[in-house]
């Protein structure tokens, strides 16, 4: 992050975005503009209006997400189609998280041949666990905080753009640990 700026304009951007946004973004050198606008007050007006033409990411523009309806690689098309046939709608992040949770527990029960909670937990957070989850690599849980290690999709509203971790990032345990805070930096303990 090179610089953080607070959007404190009160003008109606539907009429003035073409003038306000270039001035707001002028003077800074950046590769991508990351927007945090959960309320939707200004973020929609930033695309194609910045002083320098740069990608927009965050709550508007490109979005990092665990699942997106346009994800089609590694068998995801079949997963999407099965879900859509059953539910009559596109699979969302919440649906994918629920599927991953249930599938993980089912996998742990099958592999341990046990319904003992401590054995299931030990297997889930152990080195042997890995779940094929339509992301190109098996997902797993970090033993130290319980966080799901998974590739993150970078999507535009109607298309997939990329899958992270990006090529070239290496880690001694898992490429998936290159994203977010790693064990030495984190204060989160499960």
What is each model feature region?
Residues 1-190:
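Extracytosolic ligand-binding ectodomains
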